[in-house]
Amino acid sequence: MTSETEKRIIALEETIAHQAKTIEELSDQLAEQWKVVEQTRAKLDRLTERFLSLEEQSLDAPAITRPPHY
């Protein structure tokens, strides 16, 4: 192999190594973001259940009437 070919191969290997590292970092970040999404989804589900429960309770509440002095 010529010196120029060896340099090109080394440059390609370095590029591949950097890309592999970047892919691994992005994969880790994506996994972390999915955890956050799942936590947010669980919170939203709990809030939705609570809201629906409160809404049902408010339907059963007596109607608000005006005091006699109005």
UniProtKB/Swiss-Prot annotation:
Report TM segments.
Answer: none
Give the signal peptide as a residue range, or say none if absent. Answer: none
- Taxonomically, the superkingdom here is Bacteria
> InterPro entries from the xrefs?
SlyX
Pfam families per the record? SlyX (PF04102)
Homology family: Belongs to the SlyX family.
| Protein's recorded name | Protein SlyX homolog
Organism phylogeny: Bacteria, Pseudomonadati, Pseudomonadota, Alphaproteobacteria, Hyphomicrobiales
